[in-house]
């Protein structure tokens, strides 16, 4: 960094109008696990079974009971709601699941904004963990909530099945029953809720599916100035309660996005900032000299440091000596496996097990693969994605640190020579497939920028201690933007042979459809226990026909598709259920990319929301260019500069 940059920054500060700064507070929990406890403030609430139990379940409550409990779970970082001249806006969407344990159940759950981290004493029962008999109707309570009430506890309640807006009070400002909408809050079914505040009006939407934003799902909209009831800074989260009437109050997923007000500008701020900028400029200059001297010694790479410092995803930076100590200096006894990009070692850091990937010096694009992993998954949080904990670059060593997966990669369980040793039951395999579909659907549709994995295969699927699947190895992954342009040609083909869609060899393009194809091959692998290059007939056939896909289509044509079942399952499976999964896998492997289902459709089939797509008994011929889809679609693609080479077909 040069002095001129500091002077330019100083000039901008002096000439710009000093205004209130606004930042975006944004987080997304597609599901919950124990590691998320560090991101929440919990008061008598727990993370169990992939959800926040806002009031304890049977095993978690004081004295082993769920009666007469109040609980609270808040996001750890406070949200600045307003300042002298500005009011924040926010949107939040969450999936709740409330199931009664008595008949009727009680009492309810609420989304809240409050400065208080804990529920008031004696706030169980009708008080929903928000207020108690003493603080009810008291402006010092400082709480605004959207309640999902499951019991008519007082005369003002419409019924025991309504949504309401409450301000410092258990008696509602506005309430609407859901009974006329065919929705029962404590049915034990997932409900999706969306709360929107535009600075003037608060609107609430509720639906039994994910299409909550449709206007018909609007429950109520109410004009309210939140700054009149709440302090400048609040927490957002959930509160719930039970009485002698009990229920389980679960939050299964939660996302929040809002404009966070940082405060009002003034001249004091200006005069404090000017000398700081000057000092920072000098420090940056000296720092640049230091980094350059270290770079010459081969210890760091300023280009990599700068690129990672500027990206939104910025996981922890480790020291090389820390990782050497954690892995026993990368000792052979700690080696977990080896893949196309390098070796993986088990380590111990701050009392927890970690996995450290040491990117191979022979990987000619090691820097690109290294940066790709950090920039794509560094800030993703999904229960079916391997969590990236941090990175290190020192002395020409590229190192990535992940959460440790005790059961290793999926391929070592699928491709056992002695099938009788397999411990992957049909239920376990189904859960693996469903978990991976959730991960891929999240990458394609749930992120701010769509992410293509481009290397989906069994060796890139990791298993935790309960055999839950997590997709990993994002060395080839890329973030892409929507574009009205057609696909760009690429210089090289990316992926692993056997998992690559046929059109890839002709156009060299990576798309969501090529990801779906690879996922289809993986589905067939998981069910059959066969590798993608499995050959049934040992004659001279071409690569297109010599594959697990062709073998499955032959079985389907002969009416014996369930014969593909891995002998390791010992015929302990539902044939119709397996047939449905195999047909879905074949649909994903359709030669025409425009005929493959989206991951959203795949997930709906796996969760029983819809039937598998129609699959022809004869495998369609591969024709290029493919027949266009029957609808207009927005194109997602990668440019040539974003392509890497093929990866080796080996496990970690």
Curated annotation (Swiss-Prot):
InterPro entries reported for this sequence: ConA-like_dom_sf, Kinase-like_dom_sf, L-type_Lectin-RKs, Lectin_legB_Mn/Ca_BS, Legume_lectin_dom, Prot_kinase_dom, Protein_kinase_ATP_BS, Ser/Thr_kinase_AS
Catalytic activity annotation: L-seryl-[protein] + ATP = O-phospho-L-seryl-[protein] + ADP + H(+); L-threonyl-[protein] + ATP = O-phospho-L-threonyl-[protein] + ADP + H(+)
Cellular compartments per GO CC: plasma membrane
Residues engaged in binding ATP: 336-344, 357
Superkingdom of this protein's organism: Eukaryota
Segments on the Cytoplasmic side according to the record's topology features: 288-652
Record-annotated active site: 455
Enzyme class: transferase
Subcellular location: Cell membrane
KW Cell inner membrane (keyword) present: no
Endpoints of the signal sequence: 1-20
Region annotated Legume-lectin like, chain positions: 24-257
Single Gene Ontology MF annotation: protein serine/threonine kinase activity
Extracellular compartment segments: 21-266
Main localization, broad class: membrane
UniProt-listed Pfam families: Lectin_legB, Pkinase
Entry protein name: Probable L-type lectin-domain containing receptor kinase S.5
Organism (species): Arabidopsis thaliana
UniProt gene name: LECRKS5
């Amino acid at each position: 960094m040069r002095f001129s940059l500091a002077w330019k920054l100083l000039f901008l500060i002096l000439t710009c109008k000093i205004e209130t700064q606004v930042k975006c507070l944004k987080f997304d929990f597609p599901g919950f696990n124990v590691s998320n406890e560090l991101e929440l403030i919990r008061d008598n609430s727990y993370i169990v079974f992939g959800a926040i139990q806002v009031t304890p379940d049977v095993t978690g409550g004081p004295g082993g009971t769920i009666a007469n409990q109040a609980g609270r779970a808040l996001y750890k970082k406070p949200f600045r709601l307003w300042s002298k001249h500005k009011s924040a806006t926010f949107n939040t969407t969450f999936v709740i699941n409330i199931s009664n344990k008595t008949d009727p159940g009680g009492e309810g759950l609420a989304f809240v904004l409050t400065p208080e981290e804990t529920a008031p004493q004696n706030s169980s029962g009708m008080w929903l963990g928000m207020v108690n008999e003493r603080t009810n109707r008291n402006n010092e309570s400082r709480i605004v909530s959207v309640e999902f009430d499951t019991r008519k506890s007082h005369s003002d309640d419409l019924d025991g099945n309504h949504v309401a807006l409450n301000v410092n009070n258990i008696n509602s400002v506005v309430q609407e029953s859901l009974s006329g909408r065919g929705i029962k809050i404590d049915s034990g079914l997932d409900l999706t809720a969306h709360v929107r505040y535009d600075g003037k009006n608060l609107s609430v939407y509720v639906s039994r599916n994910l299409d909550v934003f449709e206007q018909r799902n609007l429950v109520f909209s109410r004009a309210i100035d939140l700054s009149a009831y709440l302090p400048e800074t609040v927490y957002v989260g959930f509160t719930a309660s039970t009485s002698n009437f009990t229920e389980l109050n679960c939050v299964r997923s939660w996302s929040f996005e809002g404009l966070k007000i940082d405060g009002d500008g003034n001249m004091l701020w200006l005069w404090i900032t000017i000398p700081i900028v000057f000092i920072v400029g000098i420090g940056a200059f000296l720092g640049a000299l230091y980094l350059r001297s270290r770079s010459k010694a081969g210890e760091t790479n300023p280009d990599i440091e700068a690129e990672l410092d500027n990206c939104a995803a910025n996981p922890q930076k480790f020291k090389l000596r820390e990782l050497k100590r954690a892995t026993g200096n990368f000792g052979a006894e700690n080696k977990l496996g080896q893949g196309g990009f390098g070796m993986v070692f088990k380590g111990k850091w701050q009392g927890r097990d970690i996995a450290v990937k040491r990117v191979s010096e022979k990987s000619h694009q090691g820097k690109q693969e290294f940066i790709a992993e950090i920039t794509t998954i560094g800030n993703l949080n999904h229960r079916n994605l391997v969590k990236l904990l941090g990175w290190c670059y020192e002395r020409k060593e590229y190192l990535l640190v992940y959460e440790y997966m005790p059961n290793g990669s999926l391929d070592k369980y699928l491709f056992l020579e002695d099938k009788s040793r397999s411990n992957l039951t049909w239920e376990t395999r189904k859960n693996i497939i469903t978990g991976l579909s959730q991960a891929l659907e999240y990458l394609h549709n749930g992120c701010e920028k769509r992410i293509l994995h481009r290397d989906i295969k069994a060796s890139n699927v990791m298993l935790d201690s309960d055999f839950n699947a997590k997709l990993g190895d994002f060395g080839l992954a890329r973030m892409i933007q929507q574009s009205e342009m057609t696909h760009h040609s690429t210089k090289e083909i990316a992926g692993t042979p056997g998992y690559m869609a046929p059109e890839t060899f002709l156009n060299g393009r990576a798309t969501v459809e090529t990801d779906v194809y690879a996922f289809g091959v993986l589905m067939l692998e998981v069910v059959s226990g066969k590798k993608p290059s499995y050959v049934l007939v040992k004659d001279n056939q071409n690569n297109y026909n010599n594959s697990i896909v062709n073998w499955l289509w032959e079985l389907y044509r002969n009416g014996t598709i369930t014969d593909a079942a891995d002998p390791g399952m010992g015929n302990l499976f539902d044939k119709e259920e397996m047939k449905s999964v195999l047909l879905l896998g074949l649909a994903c492997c359709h030669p025409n990319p425009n005929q493959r289902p989206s991951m959203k459709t795949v997930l709906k089939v796996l969760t029983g929301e819809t039937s598998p797509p129609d699959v022809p008994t004869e495998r369609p011929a591969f024709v290029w260019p493919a027949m266009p889809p029957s609808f207009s679609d927005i194109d997602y693609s990668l440019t040539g500069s974003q392509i890497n080479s093929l990866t080796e077909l080996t496990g970690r």
